[in-house]
Amino acid sequence: MASVARSSALLKQVAAQQSVAANGLRVAAFHTTSRKSLLPPPPQRIEGTVNDPVEVPPPSPSHGSYHWTFDRVVAAGLIPLTVAPFAAGSLNPTMDAVLAATILIHSHTGFGNIIVDYVPSKRVPKARKVFTWGLNAATVLVGLALYEFETTDVGLTETIKRVWKA
């Protein structure tokens, strides 16, 4: 009895190995495509000796947990600001302006975090500066556009309401 069970288990194991080998070749063929890097490799330089400690940057309240907390508070504040005008039924221009400003701040800090994370200042300092200035210019431009839209047109929440019913 044990020999029959053992031979059937061995047959299952051999079948599984053959299946893995056949599928493995297809997966390996799929994953062996060439990979292109977006940035050239960084220069190989060593500052100091191996026994020197790593420089710790000075603490700043605009980085770390303070920055993360501010982002989360703004994101959480968008929830009631988005729902309140439609739930209450009143279109208050002050609340509309606060909603537009909060969306603008949330977008600016979010895109700023993307730039900080994916455009390293040590590796590409000029590109980092260009992206940061571009973000600042876009934020000012969108802020002016939202101000103009709020003061001379129907406003953000009324526009959303009209588009929703269209």
Curated annotation (Swiss-Prot):
Stored Pfam families: CybS (PF05328)
Name used for this protein in its record: Succinate dehydrogenase [ubiquinone] cytochrome b small subunit, mitochondrial
Mitochondrial intermembrane membrane side: 88-94, 150-166
Originating species: Neurospora crassa (strain ATCC 24698 / 74-OR23-1A / CBS 708.71 / DSM 1257 / FGSC 987)
Membrane topology: Multi-pass membrane protein
Keywords, comma-separated and alphabetical: Electron transport, Heme, Iron, Membrane, Metal-binding, Mitochondrion, Mitochondrion inner membrane, Transit peptide, Transmembrane, Transmembrane helix, Transport, Tricarboxylic acid cycle
Compartment(s) of residence: Mitochondrion inner membrane
Cellular component terms (Gene Ontology): mitochondrial inner membrane; respiratory chain complex II (succinate dehydrogenase)
Family listed: Belongs to the CybS family.
GO biological process, any: mitochondrial electron transport, succinate to ubiquinone
Membrane-spanning parts: 66-87, 95-115, 125-149
Location (main, coarse): mitochondrion
UniProt keyword Iron present: yes
Residue intervals on the Mitochondrial matrix side: 1-65, 116-124
Listed PANTHER family: SUCCINATE DEHYDROGENASE (PTHR13337), SUCCINATE DEHYDROGENASE [UBIQUINONE] CYTOCHROME B SMALL SUBUNIT, MITOCHONDRIAL (PTHR13337:SF2)
Residues holding a ubiquinone: Y118
SUBUNIT field: Forms part of complex II containing four subunits: a flavoprotein (FP), an iron-sulfur protein (IP) and a cytochrome b composed of a large and a small subunit.
Superkingdom of origin: Eukaryota
